[in-house]
Structure formats: structure tokens, C-alpha cells
Amino acid sequence: MYIENINGPEDVKKLSDDQLNVLAEEIRKALLEKLSKHGGHFGPNFGMVEATIAMHYVFESPKDKIVYDVSHQSYPHKMLTGRKDAFLYEEHYDDVSGYSNPEESEHDHFTIGHTSTSISLALGLAKARDLKEENGNVIAVIGDGSLSGGEALEGLDYAAELGGNLIIVVNDNDMSIAENHGGLYDNLKELRDTNGEAECNLFKAMGLDYIYVKEGNKVADLIEAFKRVKDTKKAVVVHINTQKGKGYKLAEEHKEEWHYCAPFDVETGNPLDSFDGEDFSSVTAQYLLKKMKEDKKVVAITSATPTVMGFTEDKRKEAGKQFIDVGIAEETAMAMAAGIAAGGGKPVYGVYSTFVQRTYDQITQDLCIDSNAATIVTFWGSVYGMNDVTHLGLQDIPMMSNIPNLVYLAPTTKEEYLAMLDWSIDQDQYPVAIKLPGGEMISDSKKITKDFSQLNKYEVTEKGSKVAVIGLGTFYNMGCEVAKEVEEKTGTKATVINPYYITGIDEILLEDLKKDHDVVITLEDGFLEGGFGEKIARFYGDSDVKVLNYGVKKELLDRYDVTELLEKNHLTVQQIVGDLKF
């Protein structure tokens, strides 16, 4: 196999056209083998094989710098830059991350996982090159809907003004994670339909040079195009028309489902571990569709991740105009939600915890200053969520709980969540966010009668003395286990509290605990610093009550093991009980 002899881009350059085509098939075969066992981003990488080969054939990486947007489509790049073993041999599968990583290779220039950043990052590299009076090409590779992100458009807007070498490869596969949304994609289609000759051209309108490659999965055509723009003295867009998922029929035919995959059977495409039960995503879609039928003012909003809310293609069609996908544009999603709320609508914006930080300003300015009553549902904000350093869901508690006027809620069960969601949608006084628990969804069938408009009212679920355990959201059940262990080991029945609210404290309840409690334990699923527990500790600061805060130490974790992380942060029942001194 040719791939076995590729130790760097210099080896790619030695191959003939026919050999490069064989190399492309070998890369796909290796990707299929690994992803079927390991999981990962499927469609984006299968569509970028030829373009990656062509770039490394023409350009001189790492002197010529290639920046992949999101970098979820960088697997072929890794295979051609000295990391092939991580794709050829199962025992080495975990040697590399799923994104670009400078610690792995000099051919990776940034740790990237969020979208729409590549052009701006490339602009910076190009400017640094020019300041140092050096030579070299800087290439930004962007696709999978990333052009709909505001930062990408900002970068395009400035690129022509830069005045030096910058090559922007637009990987146009007519898809985001799901279908693309936004007017600019109509222009991309027009360019595809006219072989790049359409009079209306977004890129030319921004002052950029432009060439179109119709066959974006043909190595020879791509090599020719990249040779044309190599060493250009200005910014140029190379628009390549590729097929997402190319080489695996199921991925070609079902692009949304095969954007990312869990381990699967190659013959059938069926996942090796199937899950047919309810989760917070499916429950959210089911509830909202029912609510939409009852109230035409209810609208669900996503920023290119519809299935996180459970809105698969059939459910999006069922919702019709009451479902909005703004593309990869969290800022617009949040500001639009604020506008809908201000206009009398009832918006619900579902978003991964890791992407909330992309719209922090809109939450503060557009939502909370005027108290526009929109609902934000944050998914996967947990140690049990995504564990890549670029996608951690551990920051939303300190980030969101300190925004004035925002009510941030933490349910522990399906029933609590739906009660909170129902209240939030129908009330018109507060912007509300709901942090969904991590791990498997718990359903206890309890009827929830709590009035959530009585803000910051905690609930004592078990009354005891001496020790009080406040378990927030995901970690409420751990709090119950801590209380049980305390009673078994010491005979002391501990108080257990479900706080519900992240953004405020129940001063009356906390004051009452002073009467017969010596220790208050707080448990939270996220970073400790600036978080929930510190609010409790601050309340007891001048009293004799000792407060023990448990959560995750603030650090940039990458591909952590959950069990090890919990133990490292003293977040096991045995460790917590062991910290108590009677």
C-alpha cells in the first residue's frame, strides 16, 4: 500500500497521478475501518480526501500553512503528515485527537474545534508572515456550512484588504451537519450550476479573486487549480465542488446521518450499540411539537445542530414554520430569539453547552438587559458530555449564572425538565436557561407542582441535621448517595437539598440551616471557580458553618476519562464522605 510509505508530504509528491488516485482509495479504506470501530466525523473526511492529497502535493507544508476550519475534516491531512499509524492500526487509534493539534505535528497550527474561525486565523498567519518579510502560502480550508458563521464572513470581508498571499479553499458539499441555510448558499448553488460563471458572485463582490473546480473529488483537477494559485500575491478563493461522504454509499445517500458516526457495522451501517429509549433530545422535540400545535407562537431555534433538540428531518417538516435553523450562527440565533420574545413570540433555543460561549454578548445585551422572555436549553453541559478540549461543556455554570436578569435552572429528571420548560415558555417576565443533566436521562414519574416563578426557592428532599448536601442538577443523585453513606458510617441523617436554581440562593433556607448544621456540601457538574458552590460559600463566609465545594478544577482538559476526572477532583461518594470530620 502506498499509504504505508507516506511519512510526510514529501512522499506524496513522489507519486504519479494514478498512484495518487490509489492513495485516495487507500485513505478511504483506512478511514472506513477506523471509524467503523472507533467512531468520529465521517462524511466531512470522506469528501475531503482528494483535496487533501492535492494540497500536500502542491504546497510545501509546514512552511506553507494549512488551517482547517473546525478541523473535523483533517483526518486525511493527519494521515499524510506522519500520523498514519493512528488510522491504520487499532492499537494506535487514540494516538491522535479528532481535530488539528499543534502538539501532535508541526503541520497543525492551531487547536481548532469550533467553526468559522479558519479565515481569520489564516489572516493572522499571513499578516505575521508579511511583518517578518517571509514567503510562503497560507491556506484556509472552510466548508460544511461554516461560511454561515459571522466570523467567516468577517474574515472574507477583510481578506482582500490584507494585500498579500491568502488562499481560501471553499469545500462546497451543499451541506452543513444537516442542510445548509441562508441566502449565501443560494449563490453557491448558482455558482455550481454555472461552473463558477454566475454574474452574482459573493466572493468577487468582496474583492477576492475566484476560481471554480467542478470536480472537487478529482486529484488531477485539484492539483491544476492549486498550482494556479500557489504563490499568489493577493487573496483568492478556490471553490471546490465535493461530495460529502464520497466512497461509502450510505453516507452519500444520507449525508446528515453520516456527518458523525458511532461505531457501526460496515455492511449494514447499523450502529454496534443501538439506543431506542428516550433521551433529553427526543423528549424535547416531542414536547415542543405538542406545544407548537397548542400555541402557534411557540418556535424552536437551532444554529445548525437540529438533532441536539431531537428535530430530525421528519420532525422539522412537522414543525414547519415553527422551526428555525439559522445555520452556524449562534449570535443570530440568540438575538433572533430575543427579538421573537420582544415581539410576543415564545422562542426556545437549543444549543450545546460548548457553543453558548459563542453568543455570550447576545445573551447579556439582547436578551437580559430588556428581560426578553426567551428560553435557552443547554445540552451536554457536563463531565459526561463531550471531552475534547475544544468542546468541553464545563464552563456554562460560571459563565451564565452570573448574568443579571437571567434565570438559570438545573433539573435532575425528565419530569423536572418538562415542568421547567413548560413554565419558561408560557411566562413573560424572565429570560430563562435550562441546564440539562449529563449522563442517562432519569425519569421518576413524579408530578411536579413547584411554582418556578418563586425564584431561588430550594427544596429540602430529605431532612436531617449536622450535614447538608446541596446537589445541583446532574449531581443531585450523588448528593443522595453521599447522605446515605454518611448515615451508614456515622449514624447521622444528613439533609439533602435540590436547589433547582443556579443563578440565585435561597437565603431563608440557608439561614435556617445554621440552626442545626455544621457542614454544607455543594456538588456541581462544571468548573468550581465562579460557580454555584462559591455562592453558597460566600453566604456562609462570616458564620461557623463549614462549606465544602465539589466540582471540577478549572483547566483545559482533553479526552479525559470520566472516572479518573471525578476521582482527581474528589468527586466520588467515598472521597466526599472521607473529607467530613466528626
What is each model feature region?
Residues 19, 24, 28-31, 42-47, ...:
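Cofactor-pocket helix-loop regions in the catalytic cores of large enzyme subunits
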Residues 86-96, 161-175, 368-380:
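A glycine-rich helix N-cap at a beta->alpha junction
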Residues 41-162, 298, 303, 312-313, ...:
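Cofactor-binding active-site loop characterized by glycine-rich and histidine/acidic residues
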Residues 29-36, 95-111, 133-139, 312-327, ...:
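Glycine/charged-rich beta-loop-alpha catalytic/anionic-binding loops adjacent to active sites
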